Amino acid sequence: GGYTMLIDAAESQYYPVIEEFLQEQGVERLDVVVASHPHSDHIGAMAKVIQNFEIGAFYLPDKPHTTATYERMIQALEDKEVAVYPAAGSKDAAIAWDPLVTASILSPVEGVSYDDLNNVSAVIRLSYGDTSILFPGDAEDEAQEIMLSKLPLSCFPSSVLVIAHHGSSNASSDPFLQAVDPSLAVISVGEGNDYGHPHQEVLDNLERLGIPYY
């Protein structure tokens, strides 16, 4: 239906890459933007995105941060008078977006307190017809366990799983992988990163469960 959504915006130096890609797709308006959580590798370029594109609605977890990067994003939202909504998960939470696509918010689960910023990540499941994609941000084992305990298991099965936290070993538990049961997995990771992502344990788990990954 021509509707657009952007989830996260990398470090600030990658804004030209984001802008070039969106322009190549003919995108001038982003109907929905999601900032999964306030770490700079997810919102570093977000202020520039807000400044340079029309945005219909902006979602982020209700977990303020004190960094200059976060403050720039909030200031840009205020300057552009963008409608901002909390990303709060439940079995019925959804983003009003494309009428042909269901965009469910699974986490952070309403009423739960999270200490680690990674675990407040907005976990988004998009479904269109028989195809679905789960975007878990940096949600680690704790957040995944809470989702599994608080939400119906029917919320999780997805055709494609973006592996949480760039393939960190503390963010892809067997129960979560089995609940999602993806046909394939995608790992978003910088080559030669300082953290050793993706961790070999995660790759071994995916292979053991018969989940191809890219």
Q: Where do the protein language model's features map onto the residues?
A:
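Non-globular, low-confidence helical/coil segments that flank catalytic cores
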Residues: 1-214
